[in-house]
Amino acid sequence: MGSSCLPPGFRFHPTDEELIEYYLKRKVEGLEIELEVIPVIDLYSFDPWELPDKSFLPNRDMEWYFFCSRDKKYPNGFRTNRGTKAGYWKATGKDRKITSRSSSIIGYRKTLVFYKGRAPLGDRSNWIMHEYRLCDDDTSQGSQNLKGAFVLCRVAMKNEIKTNTKIRKIPSEQTIGSGESSGLSSRVTSPSRDETMPFHSFANPVSTETDSSNIWISPEFILDSSKDYPQIQDVASQCFQQDFDFPIIGNQNMEFPASTSLDQNMDEFMQNGYWTNYGYDQTGLFGYSDFS
């Protein structure tokens, strides 16, 4: 039976319990399966990429099911020979117990991964396989000799590993132009650092000028120009009548020559670059030369 014999829209997605309880058990006991969708092949004679062409199911299902007889690695042993032409299947993890609705164990599922090359230096691939087998005590008298002769294998290829890169959204705390007259937003969070800084809105600039109408002055400090204040006048007169002696700093014998006129001095300065009564050194400093 091939995939062309399947009705349109047919999909084969059985559960682990259905695979063991119905398909594998009926195959081992020699009972008829209503729809033959699982072929019997020598699975380990093919590499995994050759198996889709051996399946009765459409390739678009991306899962392929096969009955396979156990090929013992050693005549008196229990290990299965799982080597192929280009590599080998390697078991990973522990066998999983498959239970029925009544919670009784009906079989086991083994997970295998295909490695390219020869053991133990093969390269791991994306091909995986689930191998189903019945329990050792789940037998009938008529199928005693057939017990363990078949296993059911589900082969699939994992998709490429997807890296789910989550972009962390940085909450923006800007509240520019919120309708308030202050012109200040709350705070702006920097996208590169965990720092915050105050932010001034250009739409509502903060004015540095002070409105004099908003300044409150106590009436006690307001003077009436129509009245006389003798206390203030006495204090002012005492300040102006007091003599202050300021010491003369530097050379007290220093005398400045009398200048003829401001125009003459200015003409002399424009011609020479300095007044003749002052000396000019290379440091760019002026020094008076007629000290007495």
UniProtKB/Swiss-Prot annotation:
Expressed in roots, rosettes leaves, cauline leaves and stems. Keywords: DNA-binding, Nucleus, Stress response, Transcription, Transcription regulation. Residues 6-158 form the NAC domain. Disruption phenotype: No visible phenotype under normal growth conditions, but mutant seedlings are hyposensitive to growth inhibition mediated by abscisic acid (ABA), and show decreased resistance to dehydration stress. Residues 172-191 have a biased composition (Polar residues). GO terms for molecular function: DNA binding; DNA-binding transcription factor activity. Induction: Induced by abscisic acid (ABA), dehydration and osmotic stress. It is found in: Nucleus. GO terms for cellular component: nucleus. Residues 171-199 are annotated as: Disordered. This is NAC domain-containing protein 96.
